[in-house]
Amino acid sequence: MDESALLDLLECPVCLERLDASAKVLPCQHTFCKRCLLGIVGSRNELRCPECRTLVGSGVDELPSNILLVRLLDGIKQRPWKPGPGGGGGTTCTNTLRAQGSTVVNCGSKDLQSSQCGQQPRVQAWSPPVRGIPQLPCAKALYNYEGKEPGDLKFSKGDIIILRRQVDENWYHGEVSGVHGFFPTNFVQIIKPLPQPPPQCKALYDFEVKDKEADKDCLPFAKDDVLTVIRRVDENWAEGMLADKIGIFPISYVEFNSAAKQLIEWDKPPVPGVDTAECPSATAQSTSASKHPDTKKNTRKRHSFTSLTMANKSSQGSQNRHSMEISPPVLISSSNPTAAARISELSGLSCSAPSQVHISTTGLIVTPPPSSPVTTGPAFTFPSDVPYQAALGSMNPPLPPPPLLAATVLASTPSGATAAVAAAAAAAAAAGMGPRPVMGSSEQIAHLRPQTRPSVYVAIYPYTPRKEDELELRKGEMFLVFERCQDGWYKGTSMHTSKIGVFPGNYVAPVTRAVTNASQAKVSMSTAGQASRGVTMVSPSTAGGPTQKPQGNGVAGNPSVVPTAVVSAAHIQTSPQAKVLLHMSGQMTVNQARNAVRTVAAHSQERPTAAVTPIQVQNAACLGPASVGLPHHSLASQPLPPMAGPAAHGAAVSISRTNAPMACAAGASLASPNMTSAMLETEPSGRTVTILPGLPTSPESAASACGNSSAGKPDKDSKKEKKGLLKLLSGASTKRKPRVSPPASPTLDVELGAGEAPLQGAVGPELPLGGSHGRVGSCPTDGDGPVAAGTAALAQDAFHRKTSSLDSAVPIAPPPRQACSSLGPVMNEARPVVCERHRVVVSYPPQSEAELELKEGDIVFVHKKREDGWFKGTLQRNGKTGLFPGSFVENI
């Protein structure tokens, strides 16, 4: 080995100065210079090994010297050496090391190349001027260089060039005889290189240690402090020095300069493999995830802040020290640690606008474990400040359009006031466009989402990867798509394993929803069935009709007369107008109401729609329109239109709660054998949600939305169809007890308090098979206004009311709403997910794109707790979903 290279290895790991004979070896066999050890004792009143943190009981002077180091230094001092090929003058000298100073006494020209590590070439002061080698960083020209462009430095062979700065690895900026310019590196030989900047880093956030006794190894600092980097401890921690203190600090809290980056990369521990389900850091994820897809990583090195007991510290070596071994609970806080730069490296992920949601603008599609069948649970919605409107031209349709389907959309305003708006074909016809084509039940479902937003997809076919960067697809597995390539391949990550890669786009189907105006807007729809039998499409219209005068506190309800456009495979005709009452609470202004209607009309082409298989029903009859009322205010009764046919039916829905003035809306009655009943449900938060079964009826086939049969014996086929439809539409019969939602959780299900008044009346239309039983509900009031008795009377004339049923006072849970996409064969029925509200007690910067950025005081909805102490949840502030350490939050 060359002598200069050997000297470079003999340096103190702390100060990086050349070791001399006074260096001391610790009991752990690590060697440091005496000056550094004395500095550690003086600053911390104890001596711990900077490498492995082993406590040293004896004093610095009592420590033994490193015998091997002393022998190496003696051998180098006594050994004469020959000048290298680049030496000048052919002089031979010995490189003598002084015992204390480690300085060079005599040196040849080759020594000048290796003098960057702390030695001072004293021979320069005595050199004759004819050599022309300055003491500044310099290089010797090996060839003539004339320069090819203005600004280049011209020199001749043998010239000594003073180095000013290094532009890149191939070019320098230097000076010859007072002339400055650029020259290529391969034309010169570096005699004395430019001084390397010290490895330093700048603090991006405050790093504080609350328990100084338990975390005395940590190096606290404030924002904008400049630290000297000593070495990298492990994947997430580095060792540094601030003033006279030495300790470890998290890498994500600082920004390194070029020298420190090289040091950090050089000291990077080897990673045998990466388990991407454990969410490694962004650097390891981009390189190792594709190379080692099947290998496992030590789960204890998963993250810096995973709490472990301090008992593990003593057994860890210098290379096996795990970054998470600080102390339970985690006691690290920061001023405002955000890792937006790391997350934004993935194309399509934006961290600037808080309204942009990680998975879906209006909420999270809850995914089950991989072993369970894929279901679409209730979506958790969080308020958004910025309305998101899907752009029609920003998506790539994967398949050609199949039959036309439609759905009724209910939009809500950003202020929280509710407005039931029927939307679809009429607005599209007014704009000169036809209804939006949608995929069938077994095909991919077209969705409207810009490419810059990540979307959730479900694998509909298995796929085995053929290259390193490809992902394995398992049927039913959820994926978050970041980018859709032009060749039909998608780039995304698995929501089960967190692996990132590419996969064919025709092997997956979209799951997320396109939204209407704000994140509170909800679209209810039913599972795709036989689309060819016809689907009713309802949209707002400006045609004249009875208007409801403002009443009470100025609540104005202007019912829009809605024409019903029916798309059929054969003989279904467009029915006459239907009346839909629109109620707005006093919190809703006129401008907000107009904006809600405009949004629905403008985006009527962007609604996810689906069809429901019609069910054959005998002796179906028509119900009149239900009256709509507001508690504590007078009710407006609407005249009953004439019965249109034996196959048309309607529904009256009423939901009331004590001491809560809420708008009760009712379904429309359509004077045609073909109609659709809409159930409008009002949540306690003031938002209104439409449930549209979308059941086309005819004299031969009439739809039954939900309910239980009380008379007649249907055949097996009809019974099976009804049973399947009930599961798809409601997930439970009307006799099911109400499910209590978590308190204050903004879910899509109607939350029923235990001490509140039960629901009165039916929650939906009931049309039993083989009979003519029906139920009519009314909006109960407190006696302030008349009740629309005409509707009930006429309804009782047509049907006899069921006795001993649940009509009177037993609370009935509304049917769980479906997600806004039809998964076809992979979706069974909605499954509720219990989530807990947690508050962030300590801010947490994410270490990878799969983790959440937590700020102190944030509210997180936790819906999965893992065995390793990590939680999976959704951040209420921006709706993003990801992983975070459980010790950073507390249950509330």
Swiss-Prot record:
Pathway: Protein modification; protein ubiquitination. Residues 274-323, 532-555, 688-751 are annotated as: Disordered. It is an enzyme of class 2 (transferase). GO terms for biological process: neuron migration; positive regulation of JNK cascade; protein autoubiquitination; regulation of CD4-positive, alpha-beta T cell differentiation; regulation of CD8-positive, alpha-beta T cell proliferation. PROSITE patterns: SH3, ZF_RING_1, ZF_RING_2. The RING finger domain is required for ubiquitin ligase activity and autoubiquitination. This is E3 ubiquitin-protein ligase SH3RF1. Phosphorylated at Ser-304 by AKT1 and AKT2. When phosphorylated, it has reduced ability to bind Rac. Autoubiquitinated. Ubiquitinated by SH3RF2, leading to proteasome-mediated degradation. Residues 447-550 are annotated as: Interaction with AKT2. The keyword S-adenosyl-L-methionine does not apply. Signal peptide: none annotated. One of its GO terms (molecular function) is transferase activity. GO terms for cellular component: Golgi apparatus; lamellipodium; perinuclear region of cytoplasm. Residues 713-724 have a biased composition (Basic and acidic residues). Ubiquitously expressed. It comes from Mus musculus. Has E3 ubiquitin-protein ligase activity. In the absence of an external substrate, it can catalyze self-ubiquitination. Stimulates ubiquitination of potassium channel KCNJ1, enhancing its dynamin-dependent and clathrin-independent endocytosis. Acts as a scaffold protein that coordinates with MAPK8IP1/JIP1 in organizing different components of the JNK pathway, including RAC1 or RAC2, MAP3K11/MLK3 or MAP3K7/TAK1, MAP2K7/MKK7, MAPK8/JNK1 and/or MAPK9/JNK2 into a functional multiprotein complex to ensure the effective activation of the JNK signaling pathway. Its main location: cytoplasm. Belongs to the SH3RF family. SMART domains: RING, SH3. It comes from the Eukaryota. Residues 701-712 have a biased composition (Low complexity). It catalyses: S-ubiquitinyl-[E2 ubiquitin-conjugating enzyme]-L-cysteine + [acceptor protein]-L-lysine = [E2 ubiquitin-conjugating enzyme]-L-cysteine + N(6)-ubiquitinyl-[acceptor protein]-L-lysine.
